[in-house]
Amino acid sequence: MAFSPWQILSPVQWAKWTWSAVRGSGAGEDEAGGPEGDPEEEEDSQAETKSLSFSSDSEGNFETPEAETPIRSPLKESCDSSPGLAEPEAKPQESREADEQLVAEVIEKCSPDTCSRSSENEAPQATVDSHPVKDVRGKAEHDVSKISVVRPFSIETRNCTDDPAALGTAAAHGCVPVLPGMALPSTTPEATQDEPVMDRGMGVTLEAFTEASLKTGGPCPEPVASRSKLRKPKPVSLRKKMAPEPEMLMEGSPLPKASSPWLPDGLDQNANPSVLRGSGAQRSPLNLKETAGVLSNDTSDSGVEVAPGSPPLQLEDDFTEDGENVKIRSALPKQSGRKPSNKLAPSIRKDGVSKPVGVEQPSDPTVQDALLDQMSPKLDPSKRSHPPANFFGSGPILQNSPPLSSKCSHHFDPNNINTDDSGDPCKPTPALTSSGFCPATGNHVNEILDSPKKAKSRLITSGCKVKKYEAQPLDLDACSQDEGAVISKISEIPNRDGHATDEEKLASTSSCAQKSAGAGVKGIEKETCQKMEKEELAVHGLLESSSEKAPVSVACGGESPLDGICLSEADKTAVLTLIREEIITKEIEANEWKKKYEETREEVLEMRKIVAEYEKTIAQMIEDEQRTSMSSQKSFQQLTMEKEQALADLNSVERSLSDLFRRYENLKGVLEGFKKNEEALKKCAQDYLARVKQEEQRYQALKVHAEEKLDRANEEIAQVRSKAKAESAALHAGLRKEQMKVESLERALQQKNQEIEELTKICDELIAKLGKTD
């Protein structure tokens, strides 16, 4: 298996690469954010640092530093797509102060001869209320970090006809016309305090104001020198530092204003117009209802025709949150000396409800007068209680105004750009005559921001590319569309709240590269839409400039302030040429992004192969480890069983040994008894031996005595036998003698018997003879 740099990295390098991928380019912006450290920022950074410890399941295996990573981080790519964000961020304090003085000089030159009527109405108020500005500041600087995007309500007030274009430009961009000899007591301290953070945010506003003044013929040549310094737009997450100024100026500063009443002075000077959208949506609904009467009154006095079916006061959706909570937050005082957090994600409160796109304007003149009265700066309650006192002098000025032409509006749906190429993305829609350029984008961003939070991720929401010709507010309106597109892209990056595998990291970076390439294609179509919008608005500007007695041009909240600027043919041609050049540039940039995407895609595929091999190796290692663990578990179980058996045997042996010991003790006692018996038996044996010896002695004595007696008996027997033989011989001789006698008698008997028989026979014969004779 081939090794790659991914497999031989240290944990420190991996942590650095993961940190850079999560933070993007936000690290440098945090360092330039201000000299003071915010506790909330420190907590957020600590939370992000902690979340990095759970960023991957293979942190200890391989690391990839920023320089060796073949895939760019998602946030950096989205940020690099707008070259205006890639410029240096730090700016010396002297250049900031010079910019502030330059803006003040430009305003003084543009307004000393053109603001006489408004100065007469409002100069006493400025002198009276300029002192309490510092007193009100403590309670006015409440936490309005939630208000990150404000859109100016385009009502330009022209107090005279000397230089209406320059004054209209200043009014459109929110610049404050100042009387000769009058300083800016409210904007300068606030700008000085928040300048380290607001510098890039206010660059677009100042540049737009100065260039529009130059093009319209105003005597303002000085701002050209500082344009390179001012072209440093800052992401929305860091623009929120300039939010404490609007409320302070609205509550405590009664300076004369030619800007929109819904856009305070501090916000007009410091906020980027590319994100100043939907400020009316951030006010309470009561203000809209009250101000409707003032506006309708002024319109009826001056003869302005208002179409009852087309609401001209439609406002864009808030990009961060719904406006229902803004009024409550504005009433809460902010702790002094503390800046709002520059993190976008932690400071946004999500509500599932978005503001309505438009607010219908009533046709009643009294209602319109009340509307203009409510849109004026917040003054003391005694002055606000008199509706006829219009601080803009709208009653006498609007009397000769010509009827308003139907306002051009375009329905721009970024979700349907690439689906239908044949359709015109900038087709005018009569149903949305007064809506903003990107209401769908606002709703889309609201849906993104209303989604549940996960880990804290740094979202860079400023995707607009600020050029020299983008002083026109129409281009800045299109920037808000780019903002929504960038938010929708960046929000799809997976949040790193837990363990993220290496494949997820690669997939997230590749998807971001694809979306950044698609953003270039969308930018071309957006430029085409902007071109058509500029042409139509230029026609409206010519129609309004044709009337010499039209000091006021009322534009709806969804349209650009370009209607109040009188453009010449040369200016329009130059603008169109610049737009065409920008379209070509965007096409080239899109092609470059496509090439970068293909290269990155090849690298991602290669890395996926490497990761697949790595996963196979890891799987094999895990398999071997599992087998080893199984065998070790089996052997361990066997050893455990053997151990248990040995323990059982040991217990039985111990029991046997204890029994043997007891038996041994018993046998020991028995043996002692045997020894005692042996001794007794030995004694008995000795006694028996002694007795046997005694008996032997007695036997010997008896034997000798018996032998003597036997000898005597034998002698007596011999004597008896000799005597018996002599007696038997005598008896035999007497027997023979007797036998001879018997034999002699028997023979004598036999002779007698024979003689008897012979005599008997002689007698029988004689008797027989005698009986015969008888």
From Swiss-Prot:
PTM sites of type N-acetylalanine: A2
Segments of this protein annotated with the region Disordered: 21-142, 214-428
Region feature Interaction with TDRD7, mapped onto this chain: 153-255
A single GO molecular function term of this UniProt record: nuclear glucocorticoid receptor binding
Region Interaction with LSM7 and SNRPG: start-end pairs: 2-56
Cellular-component GO terms for this entry: centrosome; cytoplasm; midbody; nucleus
Domain SPAZ residue range list: 216-294, 354-504
Modified residues (Phosphoserine): S4, S10, S45, S148, S154, S228, S376, S401, S480, S560
Compositional bias per record (Polar residues), positions renumbered to this chain: 48-61, 113-128, 397-407
Main location: cytoplasm
Chain coiled-coil ranges: 579-774
Function: Involved in transcription regulation induced by nuclear receptors, including in T3 thyroid hormone and all-trans retinoic acid pathways. Might promote the nuclear localization of the receptors. Likely involved in the processes that promote cell division prior to the formation of differentiated tissues.
Record-stated family: Belongs to the TACC family.
Subunit composition and interactions: Interacts with CH-TOG and YEATS4. Interacts with the AURKA and AURKB and AURKC. Interacts with LSM7, TDRD7 and SNRPG. Interacts with GCN5L2 and PCAF. Interacts with the thyroid hormone receptors THRB and THRA, predominantly with isoform alpha-2. The interaction with THRA isoform alpha-1 and THRB is decreased in the presence of thyroid hormone T3. Interacts with RARA in the nucleus. Also interacts with other nuclear receptors, including ESR1, NR3C1, PPARG and RXRA, preferentially in the absence of their hormonal ligands.
Protein name: Transforming acidic coiled-coil-containing protein 1
Species: Mus musculus (Mouse)
Lineage of producing organism: Eukaryota, Metazoa, Chordata, Craniata, Vertebrata
Gene assigned in the entry: Tacc1
